[in-house]
Amino acid sequence: MAIINMSDLDLQGKRVLIREDLNVPVSNGVVTSDARLRASLPTIELALAKGAAVMVMSHLGRPTEGEYNSEFSMQPVVDYLAKALSCPVRLATDYLDGVEVAVGEVVVFENVRFNKGEKKNDEALSKKMAALCDVYVMDAFGTAHRAEASTNGVGLYAPIACAGPLLAQELDALGKALDNPARPLVAIVGGSKVSTKLTVLESLSGIVDQLVVGGGIANTFIAAAGHNVGKSLYEADLIDEAKRLVANAQSRGGDIPVPTDVVVAGEFSPTAAATLKAVSDVGDSDMIFDIGPDSAEALAKIIESAGTIVWNGPVGVFEFDQFGEGTKRIAHAIADSKAFSIAGGGDTLAAVDKYGIADKVSYISTGGGAFLEFLEGKELPAVAMLKKRGA
């Protein structure tokens, strides 16, 4: 079941409709973080270089579906692309019944969520979108886990549906990390709650050699090991689940190591005083906000010997510097490792930026929810659609 790649197609004179993930933060009509826009430029430029008439669509924010709201307009994205691309770029507000687009220009459709039926993957809407193009390109990994009209339905009805370079790259990198990884395979999963990442932890505990947990998730594992976690965020109802995951990992010769030392404070604030304690010495009024240096060093050693590293989530409240040393040590260990490394998820990318290691990570995933669902072993709806159309 091969997926068709846009880079292999002849697009000369073709009407090409590209679904990108251009959902960027906007303040006072100006894009404030352009990472996703920069990531999409090579795909748009390739379509132009191949002689296509290019149309681009995306959602932006969470407007009420079916209603225009200037706060969520794509205009700031159009302004950005007009500066970044050496061709005319314009916004199309009413496009579903047809749009004029010339070879060598880019027409950006207004926010797809202004269309009623977008999120429900409405068939009539999908067919209208499909009728606008000769070739549909799905390039938005960040929304590949959602079956919506602009990410899924349109691809079922377009004359040709293919993967854009960004999506293809993403699937290649994730496949390399999970389908046939160089061992040992080490996964680092952070975040505040076990419940939100339970299926990821279950899926990974069955394939990785070492599963490292951090953040609030680690607190539940610390409690499962019989230690006091004081007033820390943890999930008492998932302690048995945590014990089962540890037993599962150990039965395969792996492990989920619990921190031996932690950094605690009496309150959650940027000015809270940090205190280093052995994990067995956590008091009733303590809150755990980071792993200690001994634990960080032990994890760094695990990372140093890895063949493949998957990183999703920090191991402490790194936004506050006094609770950031654990995440910083792990970030630098990943940067120094010779392993194939992949990082994904919003907080993880913020940590990658903060510690300046972007160029030392083998692949940085653009997807949050999609990255997690891939780690869970789920087939993403957009990928299933592309496989179906490539068959």
Curated annotation (Swiss-Prot):
One of its GO terms (cellular component) is cytosol. Substrate binds at D21, L22, N23, R36, H59, L60, G61, R62, R113, R146. The keyword ATP-binding applies. It catalyses: (2R)-3-phosphoglycerate + ATP = (2R)-3-phospho-glyceroyl phosphate + ADP. Pathway: Carbohydrate degradation; glycolysis; pyruvate from D-glyceraldehyde 3-phosphate: step 2/5. One of its GO terms (molecular function) is ADP binding. ATP binds at K197, E319, G345, G346, D347, T348. It is found in: Cytoplasm. The keyword Cytoplasm applies. Its main location: cytoplasm. SUPFAM superfamilies: Phosphoglycerate kinase. Keywords: ATP-binding, Cytoplasm, Glycolysis, Kinase, Nucleotide-binding, Transferase. It comes from the Bacteria. One of its GO terms (biological process) is glycolytic process. Its EC number is 2.7.2.3. Belongs to the phosphoglycerate kinase family. Monomer. This is Phosphoglycerate kinase. It comes from Shewanella oneidensis (strain ATCC 700550 / JCM 31522 / CIP 106686 / LMG 19005 / NCIMB 14063 / MR-1). The gene is pgk.
